[in-house]
Regions:
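Substrate-binding clefts and catalytic carboxylate motifs of secreted carbohydrate-active enzymes
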Residues: 1-154
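Short loop/turn segments at connectors of secondary-structure elements within structured domains
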Residues: 90, 152-156, 171, 202-204, ...
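Short hydrophobic alpha-helix segments
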Residues: 106-107, 173-175, 220
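Buried hydrophobic-core signal for structured, non-transmembrane domains
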Residues: 142-148, 189, 206-210, 232
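A generic structural motif
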Residues: 147-149, 161-165, 209-213
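Intrinsically disordered, low-complexity Pro/Gly/Ser/Thr-rich segments with frequent PxxP/GP/PP motifs
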Residues: 157-201
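Short, aromatic- and glycine-rich surface loops/edge beta-strands on solvent-exposed regions
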Residues: 197-215
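Short beta-strand elements
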Residues: 215-232
């Protein structure tokens, strides 16, 4: 299988939006913003708001709406890409839609019309890297996959740290791992209780790092609930 087209929309940067919109029209429901939204007959902005409210809470202003649309897009596509890469060999490819734009507006791109990178483009550099640590959490358990597109196997270390929102280390472990070539390898399955060890899931997060020759070549932050519930 090769997943060749999947995506989530977001808005371009505020600098790009201001190139086609007057200050008085900076609203998801304004005629100009709807005209620059080609999904669902101009109603796609309401879909963006639905997911933003569900996962991040109510945006405090238009700038926050634009910013959160990019965060939502980046985290959603990253989740899909990690699932697809970790499912190798059942899934042998992952291409999100789309790279760039032919005009400025809300779209599925990771680079906007003027060449400005959205948040997704920065995330894609990490989740499409040749070596990737991909923790996949569902139903209170996390499976940890090591994904390699390299043609030679290697030995590495997998570091796991659990920290609180103030940056304090709660506990950590360091394991030797073998990373086969051209493969996805499941190296651990961890229950939330084992990761948290009594810590508050809304005040804690896990950091997974794949370390090769003393350097972290892949890093992934795992949260235990949606962002709107976290106590930052």
């Amino acid at each position: 299988r090769f997943q060749s087209e999947y995506g989530l929309q977001s808005f371009p940067s505020m600098a790009t939006i201001r190139s086609f919109t007057a200050p008085a029209a900076l609203s998801p429901a304004s005629p100009v913003m709807r005209a620059h939204q080609k999904f669902d007959g101009g109603h796609g902005n309401q879909s963006l708001l639905f997911y933003i409210r569900k996962y991040y809470g109510e945006p405090k202003d238009f700038d926050s709406f634009v910013y959160l649309s990019q965060v939502m897009q980046a985290e959603g596509i990253e989740l899909a890409a990690d699932h697809l890469r970790s499912a190798r060999p059942q899934s042998m490819g992952s291409l999100y839609w789309q790279l760039n734009d032919v005009w400025p507006g809300a779209s599925w791109s990771s680079i906007d019309y003027f060449g400005r990178w959205k948040t997704l483009q920065f995330h894609a550099r990490r989740f499409y890297a040749p070596l990737r640590v991909a923790p996949i959490r569902r139903d209170g358990r996390t499976e940890v996959f090591l994904v390699s597109d390299r043609t030679a196997p290697l030995d590495a270390r997998l570091r796991l740290r659990v920290m609180d929102m103030d940056g304090r280390l709660l506990h950590e472990r360091l394991d030797q791992v073998h990373v086969p070539a051209l493969a996805s390898t499941r190296v651990a399955e961890l229950a939330d209780a084992a990761l948290l060890q009594g810590a508050d899931p809304h005040r804690s997060f896990a950091v997974f790092e794949l370390i090769v020759q003393g350097r972290a070549v892949s890093r992934h932050l795992l949260y235990f609930d949606r962002a709107s519930t976290l106590q930052l």
